[in-house]
Amino acid sequence: MRFLAYALALAAVLAAFPVAAAASPPPLAAWYMYGASAGALRSYAYAHGCDFAQDQPGTSLRVLLLDFGAARKIDSSTWGAVDFSDTTFSNADILGALERAADGYHNCHVRGSVDVVYGSSNYHLSGSGMSTTDAWYAGYHQSDRAEDLHDYQVSKGYTSQTSDAAGDLEPSWDGQLITKQLVNGDQGQGWALYYDFGSADGCPQSGSADGACNNGWHVSDVGYVSFHGLAVPLPEIYYSANASQWTVVRKWWDGAQSGDYFFGGVTGSTGVGLSPASAWSALESLNGGLVDAELVCFGC
């Protein structure tokens, strides 16, 4: 139901404002999360929430994406992520950080509203010993923590906030079967939209066929992890080729599936081939009217 509501709202916006859709939205920062301890992780998250609120332009809903690293099964009953300093945090630790991000956003709020998003990745899931069943539960518990965050936001009266989940899903990082289970687990829990802010590594740059991508993936697999169930594509567009690859994914989906594929926005970065604004414009130029006015940016 949340995905349907999101899709209907996006369709209304794109239909009502076809001219405005051609203008790149202002980029807002996303963060790779680090911390030597759970307390440090909470402190950084609070600061990021406050910074995001102070920088947020306009009155629309924007995505605050916090990427906690690679999804992991920590023990027989505990899931979480290993962060970018190779420190493992449980979902309880991550929820504590997400709540502090919500606090920071609320205390520094100026305008607009926010979707605070628990991000992780498919990096070396199988290499860490995780099975496809483990990956399903990782996605399930990620959505569950997003729902817990929403309960916290409601309990605090943070009426300008909501919450969701996300995955940096990249073909080169692990196989398509185990990666799909992250998306399936999220859908199984049922709360969170699952933004795919990953890549389409090695996929074709033209046509609409189910061509081969990196690591045994195909275009259809990228379509699945980005648009199946509660998944919403927020693709990594760092170079012009990426926009072309994702356009092939959209064309394949529209030709093979019953739904109309659209993009929830774009993930950009500093220090790459395209500026964040150019990244959004590159995808929009190939998919006119099908790219939402969202632009998250690592390094901004």
What are these regions (language model features)?
Residues 17-25:
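Sec-dependent signal peptide cleavage junction
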Residues 1-5:
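Positively charged n-region of N-terminal signal peptides that target proteins for export
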Residues 24-60, 81-108, 139-161, 172-300:
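Surface-exposed substrate-engagement region within the catalytic domains
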Residues 6-16:
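Bacterial N-terminal signal peptides
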Residues 74-86, 127-136:
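Surface-exposed, active-site-proximal loop segments in enzymatic domains
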Residues 66-74, 104-130:
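Substrate-binding cleft and catalytic face of glycoside hydrolase catalytic domains
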Residues 55-77:
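Extracytoplasmic cell-surface/polysaccharide-interacting catalytic and binding patches
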Residues 66, 167-169, 235:
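Conserved beta-strand positions
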